[in-house]
Amino acid sequence: MNKSPLWLRSLLWVVAVFLMLAAVVYQRATGPTHPARGDFEVAGQSYAYKLIRSDWSIKTNEAARVVLPDPGGDKVSDAVLVFRRLRTDDPFTRQTLRRENHQGKPLLVGALPAQPAAGKLEYHIEVTTSDGRSVRIPSQGEVIIRFKDHVPGWVLWPHVVMMFFSVLIGMRAGLGALFAPWRMRLWAWIALAGMTLGGMCLGPLVQKYAFGAYWTGFPFGGDWTDNKMLVMWLSWVVACAAIGLRPSKREVISRALVVAAGIAMMVAFLIPHSMGGSELDYSKVDQGIDPARAIETGRQ
């Protein structure tokens, strides 16, 4: 197979890097660890907020710190954090926010009680201005925070790095199959190796540390993150098994399978992270069941 021109190979790497970075940004923006952001207005002035949506469980944490910019005592007479356990009929707990000063910035601060792994709370903040006006933050709906057990960095960071490395190489393999098939096989096999290590080996370890189970996708549960990892990995297994290690007489089929695997990878990363992920069923906890045995998946 003829070697592709340098300019074309370089261009394909640039496009692959762009697609990988787009996947990183999208996964972070749609994932459960991304803070809820917005603005609220008091006395004609706008304030940007960033509300926490992920924190450590009761194993290593007492409370999740909720922080809001403080417009000042002359503008805000009261601010209340309102929360309860998700998917329960619990009455909402109301907690007055306290005023703090952090590095010269006035803040309104509250604390959400830490939950067992996969436990979730829903909350919002009610601000009463000095002129008696009520401001709800966010203006509609609730912010949902999920708690998880601590994941060691030696497991988490290699998993994250390996997954996005696999996306980079997978995108390059798919683009190469379309426009410059020279070394297509090398990139396809490297992508499969990266997903095997980062997704199918380290991924379950991250899940085990965070929520107590190695695998919560098919056939054991409805975790979309595990399921999309499985589909993505299998698509590359099929592609690599078909293309082998050397060029064949049916290169059109080989190239088509690598392109299909690349498309499957891109589609998988368009699915928001942690959809249908681990969630504590409080109805079981209230029946006396150990929280570690009361975790469900597949809920929306």
Regions found by a protein language model. Give the residues of each.
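Non-cytosolic membrane-interface motifs at loop->transmembrane helix junctions
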Residues: P152-P158, A213-D226
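Juxtamembrane "helix-exit" motif on the non-cytosolic side of transmembrane helices
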Residues: P204-W215, S274-M275
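Generic detector of multi-pass transmembrane helix bundles and their immediately adjacent loops
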Residues: M229-Q300
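Interfacial non-cytosolic loop connecting adjacent transmembrane helices
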Residues: A210-G221, K284-A292
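Glycan-association/targeting regions that enable binding to alpha-glucans and other polysaccharides
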Residues: N2-W182, G194, G198, P247, ...
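Small-polar-interrupted transmembrane alpha-helices in polytopic inner-membrane proteins
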Residues: I190-Y209
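Gly/Pro-rich turn-and-neighbor structural signature
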Residues: R183-W187
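Loop-to-transmembrane-helix entry motif
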Residues: G194, T225-V231
